[in-house]
Amino acid sequence: MKSQKIRIRLKAFDHHMLDQSAQKIVETARRTGASVAGPVPLPTEKSIYTILRSPHVNKDSREQFEMRTHKRLIDILEPNPKTVDALMRLDLPAGVDIEIKL
């Protein structure tokens, strides 16, 4: 019989907020008796946007902006119902995107 595993992927633009959220999840899972693997840092996505500085002329004058998306992966091995209930009640910041797979 295959043991159950919860895989949590976190994404955020601010890596400090992301690390705090990952730490909260790990502490909550360990407190309820589940074993945890992670948080594993995944590669950071970097999107670069180039725009013209001037609305009319000066094609050579451009400005570049970048947006970085930081990601973390947490595996909760052998979760019990208490672990799932505690994770459901966990309050995380709005800037962190959470994707959960069972």
UniProtKB/Swiss-Prot annotation:
InterPro entries, per the entry: Ribosomal_uS10 (IPR001848), Ribosomal_uS10_CS (IPR018268), Ribosomal_uS10_dom (IPR027486), Ribosomal_uS10_dom_sf (IPR036838)
Transmembrane regions: none
Record keyword Aminoacyl-tRNA synthetase present: no
Matching PROSITE patterns: RIBOSOMAL_S10
GO terms for biological process, alphabetical: translation
GO molecular function, one term: structural constituent of ribosome
Protein keywords: Ribonucleoprotein, Ribosomal protein
GO terms for cellular component: ribonucleoprotein complex; ribosome
Family label: Belongs to the universal ribosomal protein uS10 family.
Protein name, as recorded: Small ribosomal subunit protein uS10
Organism from which the protein derives: Pelotomaculum thermopropionicum (strain DSM 13744 / JCM 10971 / SI)
Gene coding for it: rpsJ
